[in-house]
């Protein structure tokens, strides 16, 4: 999980480990665009997470000084590994800062684009160029709404009538039951 070294003006030596010597370094620096810088930054963050997990693994495996004799060789070995991981972590953070600064530098002149414009919007075929179609759709929708309101009004009236009939039947049944109870 290692990332290629970043070379360019202000970003490190032109002929470092894995770098390009001489004129090739200048062309490679020009070819690095913001998207590849973001990819390199993402890989660097992944490396940082991996190294941090290794550091925590080393710390978890270290023995606490609880009065038990500790082998000096083992202690020195683990301490050396821990220091090496911390040094590499520091280098990775510096690399991430360089990538971040370079991305901000590349994007400094760009105007911010509203997020809504970045989302592709597909319009329906009939509504692209036909204003009359929109008017007819609007008219159709208003007629449909008017019809729905009329149906709802009639439905409420019918429900009211049914409620009155049910009340009358309930009263009638109540009266019949009362008369039968008085007869017995």
Curated annotation (Swiss-Prot):
Keyword Transcription regulation: yes
InterPro entries linked: Mediator_Med30_met
Coarse class of the protein's main subcellular location: nucleus
Pfam families named in the record: Med30
GO biological process: positive regulation of DNA-templated transcription
Entry protein name: Mediator of RNA polymerase II transcription subunit 30
Lineage: Eukaryota, Metazoa, Chordata, Craniata, Vertebrata
Family recorded in the similarity comment: Belongs to the Mediator complex subunit 30 family.
Domain of life: Eukaryota
Subunit (UniProt): Component of the Mediator complex.
Encoding gene per record: med30
